[in-house]
């Protein structure tokens, strides 16, 4: 490979891929291009920065220069890729272009901001860069509105509350974590958040935001309103697909790839939050780690299909942490819930009494690995 491998992106997926390639081949040319600084940080830490009193720069684990030196890379930080010429095997920016033999899209996903009047007043916490842009406002805010009661929204609500802020969480669902599990399973965490002082506005809708002399006025449905100092959108992620679309690749929710992480173009692959693997978008660390291991082999000529086992998802709410696995969102499961002071074990079984999903909390989380082994592949 005279031109080697070009990777667009520098997040967790890109770094895992680099490490796995270098374990097998120390010499193949590797070029990384990204719009950010390319410094390494642990993205899940963003859910805890406020209670930990961390600044954006405190999150940096390794600088781009150290990364390049350690793994023998060509890095192009603060560089926006404008186009991919798939036929000519060329990646273009405004001032540069790069030939590739194999190209990997690791462009991640963007935080979705609800399209309401005043949406520009909403903050997002999807990257170190985004946190850096709003850390002063968040640190100084006494009253915080979090829009979205999913995984990230629940983590942030607890974190801001632990930091002593007045937190309101709004979601149009009837319970928190509604896309992940039924209300009878999430109710333990929901109750804990309420006990801590989080004001939950469920089955409610944000209709608009407006700057006032003393903060931000949030207008809600049913003629309600509340004034806050900061509003955070935690309404999910949308895979970044614009470049792939311009390159003529097949797109659905994400960049469509097969079990080999290959797109509709034989020399272009996708990895991480931007990828849709056989119809599934999996924006969690473990599937990305396993995908990076397989893709490294495939880029180096060892065709290996990705086989994902049942995997744990961790909800990092320290006052009441949860682990879950399996098809927790399936509507047809019957839930067997055992709750005690040390924690909860909720088992989701099908009509044949086969375990299909589980959620465990607090001290009962140590049972997760045993339950994981009994889930079907």
Curated annotation (Swiss-Prot):
Query: Taxonomically, which superkingdom?
Result: Bacteria
Q: What is its EC number?
A: 1.18.1.-
Q: Keyword check for Metal-binding, yes or no.
A: no
Which cofactor names does the annotation list?
Answer: FAD
Listed InterPro entries: FAD-bd_OxRdtase (IPR050260), FAD/NAD-bd_sf (IPR036188), FAD/NAD-binding_dom (IPR023753), NO_rdtase_NorW (IPR023961), Rbx-bd (IPR041364)
This protein's GO cellular component annotations are:
cytoplasm
| Keywords, comma-separated and alphabetical | Cytoplasm, FAD, Flavoprotein, NAD, Oxidoreductase
**Pfam families from the entry?**
Pyr_redox_2, Rbx_binding
Catalytic activity annotated for this protein? 2 reduced [nitric oxide reductase rubredoxin domain] + NAD(+) + H(+) = 2 oxidized [nitric oxide reductase rubredoxin domain] + NADH
Pathway membership: Nitrogen metabolism; nitric oxide reduction
Where found, per UniProt?
Cytoplasm
Which residues, by range, are in coiled-coil regions? none
Molecular function (GO) terms for this protein are: oxidoreductase activity, acting on iron-sulfur proteins as donors, NAD or NADP as acceptor
Cystine pairings recorded for this chain: none
- Say if the entry is tagged with keyword Transmembrane helix: no
Name of the top EC class for this enzyme: oxidoreductase
Q: What does this protein do?
A: One of at least two accessory proteins for anaerobic nitric oxide (NO) reductase. Reduces the rubredoxin moiety of NO reductase.
Please report which protein family the annotation says this sequence is part of.
Answer: Belongs to the FAD-dependent oxidoreductase family.
This chain belongs to which protein, by name? Nitric oxide reductase FlRd-NAD(+) reductase
Q: What organism is listed for this UniProt entry? A: Escherichia fergusonii (strain ATCC 35469 / DSM 13698 / CCUG 18766 / IAM 14443 / JCM 21226 / LMG 7866 / NBRC 102419 / NCTC 12128 / CDC 0568-73)
């Amino acid at each position: 490979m005279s031109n080697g491998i070009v990777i667009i992106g520098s997040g967790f997926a890109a770094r895992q891929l680099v490490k796995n390639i270098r374990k097998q081949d120390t010499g193949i040319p590797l070029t990384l291009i990204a719009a950010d600084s390319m410094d390494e940080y642990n993205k899940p830490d963003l859910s805890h920065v406020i209670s930990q009193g961390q600044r954006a720069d405190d999150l940096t684990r390794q600088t781009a220069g150290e990364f390049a030196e350690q793994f023998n890379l060509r890095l192009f930080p603060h560089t926006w890729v404008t186009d991919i010429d798939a036929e000519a095997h060329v990646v273009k920016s405004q001032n540069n272009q790069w030939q590739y033999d194999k190209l990997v899209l690791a462009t991640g996903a963007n935080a979705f901001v609800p399209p309401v009047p005043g949406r520009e007043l909403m903050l997002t916490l999807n990257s170190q860069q985004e946190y850096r842009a709003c850390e002063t406002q968040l640190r100084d805010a006494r009253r915080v509105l979090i829009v979205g009661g999913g995984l990230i929204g629940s983590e942030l609500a607890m974190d801001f509350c632990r930091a002593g802020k007045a937190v309101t969480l709004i979601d149009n669902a009837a319970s928190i974590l509604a896309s992940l599990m039924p209300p009878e399973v999430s109710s333990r965490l929901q109750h804990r958040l309420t006990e801590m002082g989080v004001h939950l506005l469920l089955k409610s809708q944000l209709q608009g935001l407006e700057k006032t002399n003393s903060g931000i006025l949030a207008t809600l449905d049913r003629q309600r309103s509340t004034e806050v100092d900061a509003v955070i959108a935690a309404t999910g992620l949308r895979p970044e697909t614009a470049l792939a679309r311009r390159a003529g690749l097949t797109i659905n929710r994400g960049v469509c790839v097969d079990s080999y992480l290959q797109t509709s173009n034989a020399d272009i692959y996708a990895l991480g939050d931007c990828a849709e693997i056989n119809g599934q978008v999996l924006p969690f660390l473990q599937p990305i780690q396993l995908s990076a291991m397989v893709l490294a082999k495939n880029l180096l000529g060892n065709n290996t299909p990705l086989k994902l086992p049942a995997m744990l998802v961790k909800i990092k709410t320290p006052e009441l942490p949860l682990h879950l696995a399996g098809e927790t969102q399936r509507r047809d499961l019957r839930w067997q819930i055992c709750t005690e002071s040390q924690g909860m074990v909720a088992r989701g079984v099908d009509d044949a009494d086969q375990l299909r999903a589980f959620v465990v909390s607090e001290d009962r989380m140590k049972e997760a690995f045993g339950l994981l082994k009994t889930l079907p592949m």
